[in-house]
Amino acid sequence: MHGITDGTYRLVSEYDPKGDQPKAIMALTDGVLRGDRWQTLLGVTGSGKTFTVSNVIAQVDKPVLVMSHNKTLAAQLYGELRQFFPDNAVEYFVSYYDFYQPEAYLPALDKYIAKDLRINDEIERLRLKTTSSLLSGRRDVIVVSSVSCIYGLGSPDDWKAQIVELRSGMEKDRDLFLQELVSLHYIRDDVDPGPGKFRVRGDIIDLVPAHEELALRVEFFGSEIESLQTFNIQSGELLGKDTYAFIYPARQFIAEAETLKQAMVAIENELAGRLNELRRDDRLVEARRLEERTRYDLEMMKELGYCSGIENYSRHLAGRSEGERPYCLLDYFPEDFLVIVDESHVTLPQIRGMYGGDRSRKAILVEHGFRLPSALDNRPLRFEEFTEIVPQVICVSATPGDLELERCGGVVVEQLVRPTGLLDPPVEVRPVKGQIDDLLAEIRRHTAKGHKALVMTLTKRMSEDLDDYFKKVGIRSRYLHSEIKSLERIQILRELRAGDVEVLVGVNLLREGLDLPEVSLVAILDADKEGFLRNTRSLMQIAGRAARNVDGFVVFYADVLTRSIMEVLDETARRRTVQQLYNETHGITPRSIRKSLDQVLNTTSVADAEERYRRKRFGLGAKSGVQSAALLHSFTPEESYAMVAELRLEMNEAAIQMEYEKAAYLRDEIARLMHGLEAQSDSKE
């Protein structure tokens, strides 16, 4: 809302860089200032990579985009960076859908699934705040984003052209200003104004900018703006006077009237051509369907300047050619911005895979007359387009992938020393013969100290059998498999930490950020069977799960020293040497990370909701006809929203996998649960 001048970063922290951090900060900063396009920070778990990156940001003084591969990690990074940079613009840009069922068509069943969604108003506000900050002209902007940043947005030039500048004392016609607000997609609401709305009381116009929480009061005297005041829309408390303010659009897709008119002509022309094709091929059903849908959208654009799904016409709105890449958040940055890719070994492949999945779904819609072919150009960036746009990139990972190593020429900046002084756990290779008896002895040795163990097998069947065997010989074990969802997984980890479980067994226990300080033993059976879960990167990741305990130990059961095993042994030995030397030089004694049982219970309490929900929903509750919403009365509000969030994650995953019927079922389940939550809230009021 307020005009903002250029700023510089001010890093706030009670800690100073130490260990490998000063060296890494200097190397990365020099690389950015030197103009290096790609750099990679190899930082072991717990070495303070976010703090290192924050120091680099503060020194290079560029607008920054921080990319993460999921919303949860993005939210964590957003929170950390806001603490490090409280005086700068740290923004959050992720998908604003609480749930999202994409438009789809199943030809085999002749079933159309309409797009359905629930937009999170707060995240939408934060997204608008992001674009507003980037176009405000300030340089001290850090945007934390998921891969949503590579999906299509409106033209930044069109968006910027619509910004309305207000100054106290300027000549401004009141009615013209109201028309400008409507053209920016602000809605008049004289009863309950909120973000993106305004109310009119004579010569006083109150509005809440779409990206702000505070309101702006514009007082007119004739055709002049007499005053601008910021106030709290809820309490009415005046917070201060302003000399000037900027009003930004309330939507991300926006076009000037002339641009919209030209786009509608282009849409009409494309529709006519496509209808001729369909009718020529005697596909009359598809032709009728396409004509009805498109003409309805055109009518909405004519009357309102907007329509549901307007992003599918973004090629015409932006005046782009067929196949030309769409505008996205990256286009809102100045030319010299810096990109930081967190967990790059996961995030970069995710970016590479976005285009194909999106195209395959939309191609079916186009083929069967639900969308014009131009909808295919409302898409995420191709990986090649992404790499062309970004001027400078720092990849951050404990195990950098081939994509980033290739672009960095194999040169990485290392950060191997942890602030706690903990060393990478030693790795030992033992023969396969007698591996179960040997493993059992190791487990008992570690659990006798109160520690826990992770065991990775080659197949699901082997994991189940081993879990059964451990139970028979008195080991408290649990089998963790791929079908277990997030909250249930948290419940199992809670049992592990609380002492109810001593051993976790599974095929793939590889989870970035799996924080288990109680684990001192990691065992990998059949480690010499090369494959995705036995390659160098995977073996290093899973071995790192024992790196939070001073007694950490890793054992590979293998008869053949594969290339992957040898690389892990060599890399572990190298890291331990560096870490040991640093500890000896600085008199540091390694200590395990400690967490109290109260901390464990507090961080995993939402798992109780999952257990009660599943027991009631699919047990007694289901038999007695109790609806989902009614079950929420036994949950705390925090547990209820955690349950809804978990189901949304499952629904989004189903949609990505094109399991549309499952996603639709979960969508309906979420709607019932949300209805119950709203009913609870109303009853309390």
UniProtKB/Swiss-Prot annotation:
Location in or out of the cell: Cytoplasm
Pfam families: Helicase_C, ResIII, UVR, UvrB, UvrB_inter
Residue ranges constituting the Helicase C-terminal domain according to the UniProt record: 435-597
Domain Helicase ATP-binding, chain residue ranges per copy: 30-188
Cross-referenced InterPro entries: Helicase/UvrB_N, Helicase_ATP-bd, Helicase_C-like, P-loop_NTPase, UVR_dom, UVR_dom_sf, UvrB, UvrB_inter
Domain UVR residues, every copy: 641-676
Motif (Beta-hairpin): 96-119
Entry text on domains: The beta-hairpin motif is involved in DNA binding.
Subunit structure: Forms a heterotetramer with UvrA during the search for lesions. Interacts with UvrC in an incision complex.
Family: Belongs to the UvrB family.
PANTHER family attached to this UniProt entry: UVRABC SYSTEM PROTEIN B
Name of the protein: UvrABC system protein B
